[in-house]
A protein has these predicted regions:
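Beta-strand->loop->alpha-helix junctions that form or flank phosphate-binding loops
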Residues: 38-41, 99-102, 233-246, 283-287, ...
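Short, basic phosphate-binding NTP loop
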Residues: 1-114, 295-297
């Protein structure tokens, strides 16, 4: 029997937010006999789907229960400082966790890689997954990419690759990755976090939760200074672009050799060395990587013209990486 699951069956939960994440939590609870929960969503149309069913919970029930529950699972993107339930949530802030926390509470035995940063998270996660699978690791991928984390059917010897947003990390308390990567930090989500400093703090939260035998990866001297100042327990791995450049010409993959992927690849290479993947099998595994849809995706070529779909880049900072890689550009926004 899963001792962690049995322990959590006797805890009381409040689920706030019934989007993809909230619904994945409900499914997991129902599947595993976890019946002690109330739920709510500010969006009446979303919440209405649960009325008249076994999930029926009124707002009054939610507000009355929230002071007595053990954990409040908040969906990513919900800012407790701006919600209608601000007062009661702030009072119970110490109880707030995310679906990532729940995953770690349920499966503390799993090894994990958490990738965060402003740009390149999804691509980096997929490259890591690809390299690990090609080198005979048992891998699952989830979080902000692919399936919600609680949907994963992870075996005891699996290595989990998780894409984590600043929203998730801001609330996290039990996420303890063996390997944590902060790819980059540029201005983003300040409307949610309140300031650039708080945004950076949310990213660095991942290092504060690590143990002394875990690894932390960064590539910026500015972030390095912050890491040393905070004296985190984990082992620091500074990602130097020069290390990857030494093998770049051996990699036969135009997608990965693009300027926009150099930072991502530097992290993947640094991680592969810590995981003791040798250089030759590492290079060989990258040959078959095809890239992600809508991320610097070449979908048509004609008369020396190349058509690139980069529609996943919804911010200028993200688009800038793709634009740097090309000349004579007609940029359609």
């Amino acid at each position: 029997m899963n001792k962690s699951l049995n322990y959590l069956r006797h805890k009381n939960f409040a689920i706030y937010g019934l989007g993809v994440t909230g619904r994945s939590v409900i499914r997991y609870f129902d599947k595993n006999g976890m019946k002690n929960y109330v739920l709510w969503d500010d969006n009446k149309k979303v919440f209405k789907r649960f009325l008249g069913s076994k999930y029926r919970r009124m707002k009054s029930d939610f507000l009355e229960s929230i002071n007595f529950v053990d954990y409040i699972i908040v969906s990513p993107g919900i800012n407790i400082n701006k919600t209608k339930l601000k007062k009661v949530l702030f009072k119970n802030k110490h109880k707030i966790i995310t679906d990532l926390d729940l995953f770690y509470l349920l499966k503390p035995y799993l090894k994990s890689i958490v990738v965060t940063g402003t740009n390149g998270k999804s691509t980096t996660c997929k490259i890591i997954e690809h390299v690990l699978k090609k080198n005979h690791f048992k891998v699952n991928i989830g979080g902000n990419i692919g399936s919600p984390i609680l949907n994963l059917n992870s075996k005891k010897n699996s290595l989990i690759v998780i894409e984590a947003s600043s929203f998730q990390l801001a609330y996290s308390k039990f996420v303890k990755p063996d390997y944590a990567l902060i790819l980059n930090i540029t201005k983003d989500h300040q409307d949610w976090h309140g300031s650039m400093n708080k945004y950076i703090e949310s990213k660095f939260k991942i290092f504060s939760l690590q143990k002394k035998n875990n690894f932390a990866f960064i590539n910026s001297k500015k972030l390095l200074k912050r890491f040393k100042k905070n004296k985190y327990a984990s082992k620091l791995k500074f990602v130097a672009a020069e290390d990857y450049k030494k093998i770049k010409n051996k990699i036969e993959n135009n997608y990965l050799n693009s300027e926009s992927n150099q930072e991502n690849m530097s992290f993947v290479y640094a991680l592969s060395k810590i995981l003791k993947i040798k250089e030759k099998p590492f290079i060989k595994s990258l040959k078959s990587f095809k890239g992600l849809n809508h991320r610097h995706e070449i979908f048509y070529k004609k008369n020396n013209k190349i058509f690139v779909n980069d529609s996943k880049a919804t911010r200028f900072e993200a688009s800038k990486f793709a634009l740097k890689n090309n000349k004579n550009i007609l940029w359609i926004v």
